[in-house]
Structure formats: structure tokens, C-alpha cells
A protein has these predicted regions:
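C-terminal structural segments of small proteins and small subunits
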Residues: 119-135
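Conserved short loop/helix modules at catalytic or binding sites
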Residues: 74-120
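General secondary-structure propensity
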Residues: 50-63, 101-110, 136
Length: 139
């Protein structure tokens, strides 16, 4: 019976996956609304080629919690995540513990000036850490 349920769930997911927006995280994280609120406090006026991105980090083996990596790149968040996972200029925390890109909170922080992105990356990491999250990156 459990095999039938698993197959039904696989079919359901295959149909539903097409309509799930890429910015929606694939798991529930209780602190994610806090991340959205904090990220919305940051703005950039000038357009450019840099993107701010967040990566969900898995610390389940340590204390059962999740963390977040804050980064900046000229590549799209998805491309940069793939580079991290492939070991290309990879942050160790993302290479080892990165699960997925949390695109939603930083959608408004895409294509901004490099100088602004650098400042926002650092300040966003500090703000998230001040809110009690485990934060890596942000430098």
C-alpha cells in the first residue's frame, strides 16, 4: 500500500512542479518570514549587474537547524548556486551544506550596482545574524 501512495505522490509532484514558482522554497522553514521582512528593508536605487542571493544551509547533523548563506554575484542566483555546488569559487558552507537558493526574499535585489550589492550583502548578513539566524557569507 505504501508503494501506491509513494507512486501517487510522485505523479502529483510531477504535475504540480510545473506550476510551483522557482522562488518558493521546497521545504518549510519557520524563520523564513523573518528573512523576507529583513530583506525588504534593503533597497538599491541604481541598476547594475550584481545580484544578492541567499542559500539555505542544512545543519541537521549538528543541531537540527537550518542556516543561511548571503552572497553577491554577477551571475543569477541559480547559476551561482550551481557553481558553488560544482566547486567553482565555492564557499565551503554552500558546497557542503547548501540545499537550495532562497530566491524570494531577494527578488528586489537583482541587477543592482556592485558597490550597492557589496554594502547590502554585508548589512543583510549582519541583520539576519542579529535576528538570531545562523549566517555564513556576507563579506
Amino acid at each position: 500500500m505504501s508503494i501506491n501512495i509513494e507512486r501517487a505522490l510522485e505523479r502529483l509532484w510531477a504535475r504540480a512542479a510545473v506550476s510551483v514558482p522557482e522562488w518558493l522554497p521546497m521545504r518549510y522553514i519557520e524563520w523564513l518570514p523573518i528573512v523576507y521582512d529583513i530583506a525588504l528593508e534593503f533597497r538599491s536605487i541604481d541598476k547594475g549587474r550584481s545580484n544578492i542571493y541567499l542559500v539555505l544551509l542544512d545543519y541537521q547533523d549538528r543541531d537540527g537547524a537550518y542556516g543561511v548563506y548571503v552572497g553577491m554575484s554577477k551571475y543569477s542566483p541559480a547559476q551561482r548556486f550551481d557553481q558553488h555546488k560544482a566547486g567553482i569559487r565555492a564557499a565551503g558552507s554552500v558546497l557542503k551544506r547548501g540545499i537550495e537558493v532562497l530566491t524570494g526574499p531577494t527578488l528586489h535585489l537583482q541587477y543592482i550596482k556592485r558597490s550597492e550589492a557589496s554594502r547590502i550583502e554585508e548589512e543583510l548578513a549582519l541583520a539576519l545574524a542579529s535576528a538570531g539566524l545562523r549566517v555564513m557569507g556576507g563579506h
